[in-house]
Amino acid sequence: MAEERQIPRMKTHYFEVIRKALQEKFNYKNAMQIPRIDKIVINMGIGEATADSKKPSLAAEDLGLITGQKAVVTRARNSIATFKVREGMPLGAKVTLRKDRMFEFLDRLVTIALPRVRDFRGLNPKSFDGRGNFAMGIKEHIVFPEINYDKVDQIWGMDIIVCTTAKTDDEARELLRAFNFPFRS
C-alpha cells in the first residue's frame, strides 16, 4: 500500500495564492514567466577547519539535521599559504535543496528560525544580486528547532542563498515577500 505524501504548506500557498498575485501585479503573458524559487543553497564555512579537520564533518551532520538532506563537505580548491590552507583540505559543508524539501526548509526558516534570531530587525532588501537571487547570513545555527542546544559543542554561522527564476530584483522581492520573508522597510 502506497504511503500518502503530504504536500508542503508553502508549496500549496505558492500555487494557489502567490502565482495569481504575481500574475496580476506584473501582467505576465505566459504562466511560465511567473517567477518561482528554483533552489536554496545553504553553506557553512568553518574558519577553524585548518586547526581541526573534524569540524567540517560535525558541521555537515548539523546541516543534515537542519535540512533533512545529507550535506557535502566542501574542500579547498587550491592552497593558500597565508591562511595555512592546503588543496583538498576540508573547509565547510553545503546543501542544495530543491522541490519539497526546499519548501519545507523555507517554511521552518520563515516561521521558526528567523523569529528566534537575536536582535533581528528584518532582512536587508538590498541583498539581491541583480538577477533575482537573494543571499542572507545567520550567525548561529542553533536557531533551528532540529538542533539540540545542550548537545552543541560549537556554534556556527551559515549562508543561505535563495535562487529564483525572476528576471529582476523587484520581481524576486515581491515573490519572497509573498512567502512572508520579513524585509526591513
Curated annotation (Swiss-Prot):
GO terms for biological process: translation. GO terms for cellular component: ribonucleoprotein complex; ribosome. Keywords: Ribonucleoprotein, Ribosomal protein, RNA-binding, rRNA-binding, tRNA-binding. GO terms for molecular function: rRNA binding; structural constituent of ribosome; tRNA binding. It holds the Pfam family Ribosomal_L5_C. It comes from the Bacteria. This is one of the proteins that bind and probably mediate the attachment of the 5S RNA into the large ribosomal subunit, where it forms part of the central protuberance. In the 70S ribosome it contacts protein S13 of the 30S subunit (bridge B1b), connecting the 2 subunits; this bridge is implicated in subunit movement. Contacts the P site tRNA; the 5S rRNA and some of its associated proteins might help stabilize positioning of ribosome-bound tRNAs. HAMAP family: Ribosomal_uL5_B. Belongs to the universal ribosomal protein uL5 family. Part of the 50S ribosomal subunit; part of the 5S rRNA/L5/L18/L25 subcomplex. Contacts the 5S rRNA and the P site tRNA. Forms a bridge to the 30S subunit in the 70S ribosome. This is Large ribosomal subunit protein uL5.
